[in-house]
Structures are given as structure tokens and as C-alpha cells.
Curated annotation (Swiss-Prot):
InterPro entries: Nucleotide-bd_a/b_plait_sf, Ribosomal_uL23-like, Ribosomal_uL23/eL15/eS24_sf. GO terms for biological process: translation. Belongs to the universal ribosomal protein uL23 family. One of its GO terms (cellular component) is ribosome. GO terms for molecular function: rRNA binding; structural constituent of ribosome. Part of the 50S ribosomal subunit. Contacts protein L29, and trigger factor when it is bound to the ribosome. One of the early assembly proteins it binds 23S rRNA. One of the proteins that surrounds the polypeptide exit tunnel on the outside of the ribosome. Forms the main docking site for trigger factor binding to the ribosome. Keywords: Ribonucleoprotein, Ribosomal protein, RNA-binding, rRNA-binding. This is Large ribosomal subunit protein uL23.
Length: 96
């Protein structure tokens, strides 16, 4: 994986992630399913110009969804919880 924007797809902003950001300096990202912790760490450090302390990865199975008699499935995806070094922050509301 060479493209940094292919590894880190988007930042996840939820109620839980906002609390973790304020209390523990943790940020949540949706990442490529093939990416490993080392690639995620390097991508976040280069894209956002911060120092990463720790990376936790969670594989999330897609839910089964039903419309009438047709049963479908949402895609599987990977979530990364990135802990930044003390003193580093990411301004997620910049320009809003």
C-alpha cells in the first residue's frame, strides 16, 4: 500500500470518539481492510503531522440487511483507534 489516502479513508466522529478524544487523546479512523498497524501509524503521522503512541485495530463484520424478501449484507470494514503522544492534537472541526 503506497497511497496514504488509500490507507486512511476517513475520520470517525461519534459521541464515543469525541469523549475519547477529549479524555484520552484517542482518535478513530476507518482504514483499508488490508492495512496493518505499522502502515496505519505511518499514514496518520505523515498525513496529519502528529506523533502516534499506539494503534489498535478492530475488524467489523458487515450487518445483514433486509428489504422485503431480499437479504443483503453491508461490507466488512476495519476501524483503527490511534492514541497520539501527549501534546499532539488533531483539529477535526477546522473550517467548520
Amino acid at each position: 500500500m503506497t497511497e496514504l489516502h488509500q490507507i486512511v479513508k476517513r475520520m470517525l466522529v461519534t459521541e464515543k470518539s469525541t469523549l475519547e478524544k477529549d479524555e484520552k487523546n484517542k482518535y478513530y479512523f476507518e482504514v483499508d481492510r488490508r492495512a496493518n498497524k505499522i502502515e496505519i501509524r505511518k499514514a496518520v503521522e505523515r498525513l496529519l503531522k502528529v506523533t502516534v503512541d499506539d494503534v489498535h485495530v478492530i475488524n467489523i463484520k458487515g450487518k445483514k440487511k433486509r428489504t422485503g424478501r431480499i437479504i443483503g449484507k453491508r461490507r466488512d470494514w476495519k476501524k483503527a483507534v490511534v492514541t497520539l503522544a501527549q501534546g499532539n492534537t488533531i483539529d477535526i472541526y477546522h473550517g467548520v
